[in-house]
Amino acid sequence: MGILADRKRRKANKEAARQRCRDYVAIYFATHSCTDCGESDPVVLTFDHVRGTKRANISDMIRDGLGIESIKAEIEKCDVVCFNCHSLRTQERSGAYRWRIGKVARE
């Protein structure tokens, strides 16, 4: 097998592994809903790292070709939340000014 054929094969294998990880995350979102509000549309769901030390964003791990077991381990550190709830959680954790104003407005 030539060098170019070997490169193509490795590239195809890496892309197949990425696709398996993408499929795993898609199925995960399809079977989970937002921890805070119950939203279940997979298009608006994301991961919020709340336990342990964050290794990396899960999408970055998939892009970089990390294995499915690494990605599963990272997902275990997360809650599934919708983008709105993730934004609210992030603002609250950081003590952001926008969060304090919004909290007063909601009361």
Report each predicted region and the residues it spans.
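Contiguous alpha-helical segments
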Residues: 1-107
